[in-house]
Amino acid sequence: MDFSRRSFHRSLSSSLQAPVVSTVGMQRLGTTPSVYGGAGGRGIRISNSRHTVNYGSDLTGGGDLFVGNEKMAMQNLNDRLASYLEKVRTLEQSNSKLEVQIKQWYETNAPRAGRDYSAYYRQIEELRSQIKDAQLQNARCVLQIDNAKLAAEDFRLKYETERGIRLTVEADLQGLNKVFDDLTLHKTDLEIQIEELNKDLALLKKEHQEEVDGLHKHLGNTVNVEVDAAPGLNLGVIMNEMRQKYEVMAQKNLQEAKEQFERQTAVLQQQVTVNTEELKGTEVQLTELRRTSQSLEIELQSHLSMKESLEHTLEETKARYSSQLANLQSLLSSLEAQLMQIRSNMERQNNEYHILLDIKTRLEQEIATYRRLLEGEDVKTTEYQLSTLEERDIKKTRKIKTVVQEVVDGKVVSSEVKEVEENI
């Protein structure tokens, strides 16, 4: 129940004048308080109405009239006071009902004991373990795929290396074939030379035989004259010597050609052996480097997969906590707004209660004063004022405080507080 304006006026005055020489006689001036109440308890005012009573020469009759008016005013005041006391009791009952409702609301919205989510926690842990197993399996599959790719790359490199070795050996064989062809041509030339020398030797033998035969024929027709002369040349021996000489030369050239071919072959074989050993050492180093690279690549992939899973888990945790923080922030804002509303209601009801209690106290004081007046305790000859309560304006204001917060990802980015004061 709202009271926008309450004013109380109370003044009692009594005056007793000496009789004057007139037909009017004695006059008595009194004040009778009256209470005005608006709709819904608004604009309640207790004011005084002034009554003028004319007395004649008979003071006894005037006193009875004064007593009757006072009784009627007190009866009217008592009736109105009873109605206001009834309103006060009604407001107290409504206040107690509101207190009960507030208590029930606190009991209803108070944080309760949490449910038993242990079964759900177990399911969540099982699902998390399954997710981790699946992530590990995926990581293993990725590592196997990477290992297969690395093995394929290794085999491809081996193939390229073997292909290069084969091309090198083929090039060496082609060079050796050229050398062999050169040696074959040189051997053929030597054989041709030997054949020509054999032909020359045969021709020389034939000519020598013809000469010998001619000499025999010539000697057969002539006289045998023995002359003591130096022995003649033996052409057969000479031819044999020439043949042996040319055979030795041919054998020597052939041996030199063979030795040169063997030397070149040995040099090439040594070069091939050295290159093969160097290639094998390089291949061993390359294999070790590949193994190291594969192990490092596998370790890198495992760390990357672990990092990715941890980042994903961190993002999920951040999102979950951000949503929970936003929910808690909204709940806190709503609870603060409700608490502010409840506090404002309680303050308003407390003010109303104190105002009504003040009204009740003052009315009881007025009733006691009127009772003393009726009993004749405070009758005096002079006019006096018992108490005067100046009209006062009781203004009640309502202050509404609005808190606007902008929450992004669970963090308060901006906060704005607005206060609005309203007259009730």
Swiss-Prot record:
Consequence the record notes for mutating S14A: No effect on keratin filament organization
PROSITE patterns xref list: IF_ROD_1, IF_ROD_2
Further comment found in the protein's record: There are two types of cytoskeletal and microfibrillar keratin: I (acidic; 40-55 kDa) and II (neutral to basic; 56-70 kDa).
Transmembrane region(s): none
Protein name in UniProt: Keratin, type I cytoskeletal 20
Keywords noted in UniProt: Apoptosis, Coiled coil, Cytoplasm, Intermediate filament, Keratin, Phosphoprotein
Region described as Tail: 378-424
Region Coil 1B, residue ranges: 124-215
Region (Coil 1A): 70-105
Coil 2: annotated segments: 239-377
Chain intervals for the UniProt region annotation (Head): 1-69
Family: Belongs to the intermediate filament family.
Effect after changing S4R: In a colorectal cancer sample; somatic mutation
Residue numbers marked as site, Cleavage: D228, A229
Protein's gene: KRT20
Pfam families per record: Filament
